[in-house]
Amino acid sequence: MWGSTCIPRKVYQGLYPLKRHFGCAQAQHFLVFCWLLMALIRDPGKGTLKGLKPYLPPTLKYWTTVRMIRSGQWDVEAVVCDLATATLRALPPPADGVLYLIGDSTVKEKRGRKHPLGRMTRHSEHDPYTFGFEVVLLIASWEHRRVPVALALIDPSCRGHQNILFRQMLTDFVPPSWARHVVVIADAGFAANATMRLITAKHYGYVFAMPRTRKFTNGKHLRDLVQHLPKSCSYRRASSKPDGRRQDYWVFVRHATLHKLGDVTMVLSKKRRNMGPKQVKIIVTNLTGATAGTILSIYARRWGVELTIKELKSGLHLGRMQVTNDKKCVTRSVALSVLAYLLLVRLYGADEAVMQDWSLFKLKEHFIGEVAQDAVQRTERKWQHKLKQFKDVA
C-alpha cells in the first residue's frame, strides 16, 4: 500500500480546533495524532502500531507514535468531547427535535494475562468466560445517524464502576441547541437507582430494561408478576425497527409505582405468545402517553450502539494496539478508534449522498479514495512546477 507524505487540507482543518489540547509543540503531538487517525482508517490489517507504519510517512518512526500515546500532555477525554460536540453541530438536526442517548458496554478480548484492566468475564450465563477489558460507550442517535459522544474503560477493582462511568457521561454531556427532548436508552445493567435519579433530575426521558429483582412499593418483585401472568393478558402490538421494518411483539402494559423509582409505564414483551417467563423482556419508561408500540420502537434503537461497537472493532481496530501496562495509556489507545470514527462523521456526515445508509465501511472507502486522489493531485502539481522551472531555465 502506498504511503502519504502530507496531511490532506480537509483533514487538517477538521482536526485543527483540537490542537490546543496538545501542549508539547516540540514533539509535534498534534501532527502525530492526525497521522494516527488517518492510518487507523486506511489500515485493513490488525491495527497495531507497527502495522500502521506503511500508512505513515517514512520520517515518522515507530517510537515517535509510542511516545505520543504514552505522553500525559494531552487530555483524551477533552479531545473526544470537543470533537463529538463539533460533529453534532455539523450534522443536520431531526424534524421532531428528539435526541436519543444510548449506552452499552462491550468486552474486548485479550490474549495476554498482564493487561492492567483485564479480567475474566462473560456476556451472559450461556456464554463462555473470556479474558479481556470492558468499555462503556455512549452514543447520540437520531433518524439513521449514530455519533459516539463518550467512552471510558471499566476498572475491575472498582465496584459498580460501569454505572459510575455512565452517570459521569450523562453529567458531562451537553445536548445540542436543537435538542428539545432527550431520551436515554440502556439495558438492565445500567438501571441503578442513582442513574435513574440523575436522569430524572436532568428532566430527560428514559426507556430502560429492568432487572427482575426490582420491587413494587408493596414489596413484591417484578419476577412474581412475570412468572404468574396468564397468556390471555398479552396482546399483539406492532413496532418499527430503526430501519423501518415492522416487528410484532406480544405485550402486557401496566402503570405501576416501583420502589425508589416512582410512577412508570411498564411493558412486558415477548416475541411469541407461547414463550415462557424467561423470554419476557421488562421495559420501563417515564414517557407519559406513550403507547406500547412507541415504547418498543424506542427501545429497538438500542441496536444502534451494537452496530457502532461492531464497526469500531472490525473497521477501526478498537483495543488492538499493544501498549504498556499503564491504564491511562490503554485508554488513549482505545479512544483513537472512536476519534477516527468521529473524524469520518465530521467530514462526511452532512453529505446525504454518502451517508444515506450510514455505513462506516463506505465512509472508509470514500476517505481512502479522497486521500489517494489528493496525493495524486499534489504529485502532479509538484512535477508541473518543476517542469515550469526547467522551461524557464531553458
Regions found by a protein language model. Name each.
Residues 151-274, 356-361:
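An internal, acidic/charged active-site-proximal segment
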Residues 1-77:
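Gly/serine-rich nucleotide phosphate-binding loop at the start of the catalytic core
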